[in-house]
Design a protein with these regions (language model features):
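Hydrophobic alpha-helical segments within soluble ligand-binding/sensing domains
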Residues: 1-24, 69-71, 94, 118-121, ...
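Segments of small-molecule ligand-sensing domains
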Residues: 160-173, 184-240
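Hydrophobic alpha-helical
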Residues: 68-69, 84-104, 179-183
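An alpha-beta-alpha
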Residues: 1-65, 84
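Periplasmic-binding protein-like
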Residues: 25-30, 81-91, 97, 108-113, ...
Length: 241
């Protein structure tokens, strides 16, 4: 596994909020699913570290995925004076919440949502209300990385994808490429591909500079995890929409 962790989400989200100058009342939106239960866990999720940093997390209850009514949550956020909204949502749930927030006069100054805002197609579907939303950023063509297989730089990979597909690049592109890099590197170094132990030894000894950064399982937080960089970013309307 090479990716970032929830601790990185907390770090980049709070860094973004700290630079915004808004009050520390945060509306929390956590679904009753694996991601929502992890993010909303009182000890291991967002509540404890946010409280330690002086944030007041307003979280009435976990909502059911594909809910069609967020009125109870919106009323609680309005009463608490929440100026920040955060959580981890699938696109349909955020679309429903964001539409109802507008209808009910809830206008937070900062909206930082995990998962739902990763892809441009969904953000574009929100129209003008997609402008200014913020989220975690796994990878972009502006990241200072290149392919260990081809030498292609992140900028070139993004441009090639756009020109060949006619679609905008997305954050998963770099990781999809990196999977092939790691696979090729493991195969190249493995002493016997028919021996499970040899394959595992090759994987665990990986130390490779990839399209998403360094993949090295010898220095991760646990043996099967290699951390990759995470930043936050804001969606802004460009000349191409």
């Amino acid at each position: 596994h090479f990716f970032w962790g929830l601790e990185d989400i907390i770090a980049v989200f709070t860094d973004l909020w700290g630079s915004s100058g808004v009050t520390k009342n945060v509306a929390g939106l956590f679904p009753n699913d694996a991601d929502g239960n992890a993010w909303g866990h009182p000890e291991l999720g967002l509540p404890k570290p946010l409280s330690e940093m002086g944030y007041n997390l307003v979280h009435p209850d976990h909502y059911q995925p594909l809910s069609d009514d967020f009125s109870a949550q919106i009323n609680a956020y309005k009463e608490a004076g929440c100026e920040i909204v955060t959580g981890v949502m699938i696109p349909p749930d955020f679309g429903t919440f964001w539409s109802q927030a507008a209808q009910q006069g809830f206008n937070p100054k900062v909206v930082t949502i995990g998962k739902a805002l990763l892809f441009p197609s969904f953000v574009n579907s929100l129209g003008d209300r997609g402008n200014g939303l913020t989220s975690e950023i796994w990878w972009t063509p502006d990241h200072p990385f290149s392919s260990s297989l081809t030498g292609t730089k992140a900028k070139e990979l993004g441009n090639d994808y756009v020109s060949s597909t006619g679609r905008k690049w997305n954050q998963g592109l770099g990781f999809q490429h990196a999977l092939f890099e790691v696979t090729a590197d493991v195969i190249k170094r493995c002493s016997d591909l028919d021996d499970v132990s040899a394959v595992m030894a090759s994987i665990s000894s990986t130390n490779l500079s990839t399209m998403v950064g360094q993949v090295n399982w010898s220095n991760g937080p646990v043996k099967n995890v290699s951390k990759t960089p995470l930043v936050s970013g804001q969606w802004q309307k460009g000349n191409d929409g």
